[in-house]
A protein has these predicted regions:
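Class I S-adenosyl-L-methionine
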Residues: 130-173
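The AdoMet/dcAdoMet-binding core of the Class I SAM-like
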Residues: 5-142, 164
Length: 173
């Protein structure tokens, strides 16, 4: 999400009070939420060991976001965990899962829960892969967003470490 002008536009349009991160084991999204002054960040991550390994070997990405007071880590299955979250809790939800069809299907299956916990006028953003390398995958993500929100916007940013452009889809609830 860093360096994405579309993500920057999203931040300008909304309240940055509460964010939820689904996945994102490397901590990059959490770091960016901290830098954008979200007051409360709930980070739903399956495995604390993944975060520990990323902190150890990729420390610059997450900048030890788990140690920040504004970040609350919720370990375990994110989609099970969010079942207990109150309606209309989050201003922004970031979906940072693996970029494969399994994860697209997983997000689609749980989209009702994500919509439920997203505030009215809240924004959901997902990293959807590279349109250059896997255009069908990006299209599948856009279909999920459009079926649930009808207003998916695609942004693109060059990621040097990926050596390609990467896409993000955002929708407003």
């Amino acid at each position: 999400l860093r360096n994405s002008s579309a993500a920057s536009d999203v931040y300008k349009r909304q309240n940055n009070e509460r964010a939820a991160i689904i996945g994102g084991g490397d901590g990059g999204v959490a770091r960016e939420c901290i830098s954008k002054n979200f007051n409360f960040i709930d980070w739903y991550e399956l495995d604390p060991e993944v975060v520990d390994v990323c902190n150890k070997h990729l420390g610059d990405i997450g900048k030890k976001a788990t140690e920040k007071n504004s970040v609350k880590c919720v370990w375990g299955d994110a989609f099970e965990s969010i079942k207990s979250v109150s309606d209309d809790t989050y201003d922004h939800i970031f979906v940072d899962l693996n970029d494969d069809q399994f994860c697209i299907d997983l997000a689609a299956k749980n989209m009702d829960s994500l919509v439920r916990i997203l505030k009215p006028k809240g924004v959901i953003t997902a990293q959807v892969g590279s349109q250059d390398k896997k255009p069908q995958q990006v299209e599948n993500w856009l279909n999920v967003f459009n079926q649930n929100f009808g207003n998916a916007k695609l942004s693109r940013v060059y990621i040097p470490s990926f050596d390609c452009s990467w896409n993000f889809s955002s929708s407003i609830n």
